[in-house]
């Protein structure tokens, strides 16, 4: 279930939104911007809903701090306000809000905006994952996120045949904690670290299969797998066919052969 953090100082409004959204989402709440920031950093939700005017820390400041943190900068944020002037709307977008909804609002308006933002985020994750994994060596580095992911890919590929390589080793190799790497990879690609590493291994295996220079039994070990059955299972889940079928399809399409 997707997670949402609602930051709202009006108890009645907070309760209404929690009840309304609680059936479809895992909802967490906070009564002001500072509490909201703490809860967001604890939960790392899929979306944030925040009031604009709140005690201790208002929505503008909280949103700005969220966008400055690499671990939360990607999270979609909806700003709510009883004021609907253009100045507040512009300020909300300038500090990084993804949507601006004036109170009072209909439940349909809120839920539609939530669904749209979460769906857009999922599509962006897939596009980013496909782009960065297609041909890593050809990627033009555009951001710190690109640098981070490419560094991970480099370490993984350098250790594909290392039997002692694991997630802990990966994190240590880039001087980062497991928690940081997990959350960063999840935020950027939608995958867990384990899934991401497995995807890299499978893409390398597919490249070997297309070259047609090695047997499948050799390829699985060079790609970081220790079990033929597990390799076949993972490959079929990812590509929708077994390694042998993949080779046959490639042969039919490109006229090249591969011996098992």
Please give the residue ranges for each predicted region.
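Basic/polar phosphate-binding segments, predominantly the helix-turn-helix DNA-binding elements
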Residues: 167-197, 220-242
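Two-component/phosphorelay signaling modules centered on CheY-like receiver
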Residues: 10-28, 183, 188
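Receiver (REC) domain active-site loop signature in two-component systems and cognate sites
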Residues: 54
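Acidic, metal-coordinating helix/loop segments flanking the phosphotransfer/catalytic sites
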Residues: 29-47
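Terminal helix-turn-helix DNA-binding modules in bacterial transcription factors
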Residues: 187-226, 249-260
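C-terminal output helix
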Residues: 105-114
